[in-house]
């Protein structure tokens, strides 16, 4: 008999609400403990090998790989849905769904390396945005970043196209970009949305050396950026988003993701914390004492982000010397 989320909290050293902040790691821990099974990657690799061991045409091999991948995706999603209906733990679902897609993409990249192009990928395939954060709802977009080598070849582009067309043919909604490390840094400096997405990137497959270079270069770049510009941009973005959804926390039918006090407000607090305090992980935000209400294990009594913003705005003052002279009053306090 499986334990409910609340029962699990009683036997875990890490509070349930903290585990929910890192669903990808939560599910990884469950995998290592043998408590959850998503995709048998070894069996997937063996079945792919069988496809390419025959004398089929390349077109037939691709069709067989696509068919196999569809079966794995469908079976995996059905298992995740059954687990959600049984345990009622949304954090486990979004983390497990992200890992399912990780493993599916990893299998496709391996197939391309071993059988289609017969060479290792020279790019790093990174998950970014919410997928990079390890949270993938049933109909969420899959945001991918192909970090290309500085001197890329035509074969690199063909490799990328093979992966993308396989994912599209699987019916997945994929957002993607292909840039070198230096192009990513330049784009982050020009576009706050790209910069935000890179805060949550992680490597799925491909060239480890390229992914490590991307991560270290971005981290070094952030270190020398004035935090004030990013903070102001994200708060302005939040104000515009609130205005689009009525600008009130008392809506009869609130948008729980983008409305005032919704999930995106919490994401914004973490993004600002990670950028301004140069932190790699959401748990580092709690460890640094930035969001003290969260560290105590509860949100402010009001049904909005106002209390959180108040706590955060006080702490962020320490880094304003790098940008704006004073922290403006959060619009949630008006």
Predicted regions and their residues:
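A nucleotide- and high-energy phosphate-metabolite-utilizing enzyme signature
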Residues: 2-334
């Amino acid at each position: 008999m499986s334990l409910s989320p609340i029962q699990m909290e009683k036997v875990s050293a890490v509070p349930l609400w903290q585990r929910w902040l890192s669903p990808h790691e939560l599910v990884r821990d469950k995998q290592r403990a043998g408590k959850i099974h998503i995709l048998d990657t070894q069996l997937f690799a063996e079945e792919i090998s069988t496809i390419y061991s025959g004398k089929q045409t390349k077109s037939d091999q691709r069709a067989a790989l696509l068919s196999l991948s569809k079966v794995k995706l469908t079976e995996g999603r059905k298992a995740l849905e059954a687990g959600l209906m049984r345990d009622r733990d949304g954090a486990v679902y979004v983390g497990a769904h992200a890992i399912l897609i990780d493993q599916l993409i990893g299998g496709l990249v391996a197939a391309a390396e071993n059988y289609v192009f017969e060479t290792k990928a020279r790019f790093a395939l990174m998950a970014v945005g919410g997928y990079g954060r390890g949270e993938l709802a049933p109909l969420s977009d899959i945001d991918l970043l192909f970090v290309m080598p500085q001197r890329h070849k035509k074969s690199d582009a063909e490799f990328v196209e093979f992966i993308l067309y396989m994912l599209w043919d699987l019916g997945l909604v994929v957002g993607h970009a292909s840039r070198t490390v230096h192009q990513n840094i330049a784009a982050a400096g020009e576009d706050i949305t790209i910069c935000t997405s890179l805060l949550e990137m992680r490597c799925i497959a491909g060239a480890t050396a390229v992914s490590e270079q991307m991560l270290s270069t971005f981290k070094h770049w952030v270190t020398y950026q004035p935090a004030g510009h990013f903070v102001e941009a994200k708060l302005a973005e939040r104000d515009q988003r609130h205005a689009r959804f009525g600008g009130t926390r008392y809506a009869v039918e609130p948008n729980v993701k983008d409305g005032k006090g919704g999930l995106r407000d919490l994401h914004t607090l973490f993004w600002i914390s990670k950028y301004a305090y140069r932190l790699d992980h959401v748990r580092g935000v709690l460890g640094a004492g930035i969001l003290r209400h969260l560290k105590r294990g509860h949100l402010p009594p009001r049904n909005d982000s106002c209390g959180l913003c108040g706590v955060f705005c006080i702490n962020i003052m320490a880094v304003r010397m790098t940008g704006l002279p004073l922290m403006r009053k959060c619009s949630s306090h008006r």
